[in-house]
């Protein structure tokens, strides 16, 4: 996976640069890149894009025909480049890196909050306010429920994880007692 991320990075950076230069703006490009990634992740599309009977022009034409949003010329050129370099199937990874670049540019980050119980909007806002101070970023929360945590929350922001769940505390206690 690390190798694919390394291969995808220059494409994500180039796409991000093009999006910053485009008057349509980052938000519309982020939506478009998300749609491109969804289409590229589809199993039938992946199979079609590896069909040896199709040449590069046909692959690009088939792929662009599956996109519902209007494609600016820069996006068409990007798709052509990916097809020529046999990198079209990296679009989901490129999209993830694009979102990371966009978030870094905007000074924001995705906060994946996993809770044992459903959190009210007020609880999420209070938690996000405290986490924004801790991480120094504007956070976009994504809340999921996992009853196996027993209680508490686990928060992932980028590669940092803050786990205050009862399950994690019990695991630490077990490890301490076993040592």
Curated annotation (Swiss-Prot):
Keywords: ATP synthesis, Cell inner membrane, Cell membrane, CF(1), Hydrogen ion transport, Ion transport, Membrane, Transport. Pfam families: OSCP. It is a peripheral membrane protein. One of its GO terms (cellular component) is plasma membrane. InterPro entries: ATP_synth_OSCP/delta_N_sf, ATPase_OSCP/dsu. The keyword Ion transport applies. GO terms for molecular function: proton-transporting ATP synthase activity, rotational mechanism. It is found in: Cell inner membrane. Its main location: membrane. HAMAP family: ATP_synth_delta_bact. Belongs to the ATPase delta chain family. F(1)F(0) ATP synthase produces ATP from ADP in the presence of a proton or sodium gradient. F-type ATPases consist of two structural domains, F(1) containing the extramembraneous catalytic core and F(0) containing the membrane proton channel, linked together by a central stalk and a peripheral stalk. During catalysis, ATP synthesis in the catalytic domain of F(1) is coupled via a rotary mechanism of the central stalk subunits to proton translocation. F-type ATPases have 2 components, F(1) - the catalytic core - and F(0) - the membrane proton channel. F(1) has five subunits: alpha(3), beta(3), gamma(1), delta(1), epsilon(1). F(0) has three main subunits: a(1), b(2) and c(10-14). The alpha and beta chains form an alternating ring which encloses part of the gamma chain. F(1) is attached to F(0) by a central stalk formed by the gamma and epsilon chains, while a peripheral stalk is formed by the delta and b chains. This is ATP synthase subunit delta.
